A protein has these predicted regions:
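Small-residue-enriched flexible segments
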Residues: 1-108, 118-144
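Proline-centered loop/turn at the N-terminus of a beta-strand
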Residues: 112-114
Length: 144
């Protein structure tokens, strides 16, 4: 179960979020062909087997850092919380790649800021302004 399932997003949000809303495949039944995902799926819904892409991950992390910086302006955060999917951690990328992503975020948001990071399985964050449970993503909150 290395491949996330991608549910197609509406065109109105693809510029900010990409083409797919990713979900982890929790289990599969080889006899029936059924899979379990942590979301509601309508009977006729189409989803895609996707592949994780490090370059897209880098772009998303950079965009996230710049969004936070844009929201807080010239203010220095007092504390940053980072919730990183464990499926993106050592399972998918090497430790030096993870360190490079973190360094990029620190340089963008603030390198002298206390930073609390957590590996999670199911991150809660907005998608088109509505809080959603995500898989294979990074969610951050900056207190300033």
């Amino acid at each position: 179960m290395q491949f996330p399932l991608g549910f197609k997003l509406p065109d109105s949000v693809t510029e900010d979020y990409g083409q797919f809303f990713l979900r982890a495949m929790m289990s599969k039944d080889d006899q029936t062909g059924a899979v379990t995902v942590p979301t509601e799926v309508s009977q006729d819904e189409i989803f895609y087997m996707t592949r994780r892409d490090y370059a897209l991950m880098v772009n998303g992390i950079n965009r996230l850092g710049h969004q936070i910086k844009q929201q807080i302006g010239d203010k220095q955060p007092k504390l940053v919380f980072q919730f990183e999917c464990c499926g993106r951690g050592k399972v998918f990328i090497r430790e030096e790649q993870q360190s490079a992503l973190l360094k990029s975020l620190h340089e963008t948001v603030g390198s002298d800021v206390p930073w609390l990071g957590f590996f999670t399985y199911g991150e809660i964050g907005p998608l088109a302004g509505i809080n959603q449970v995500h898989n294979y993503t990074c969610v951050m909150a900056a207190i300033y």
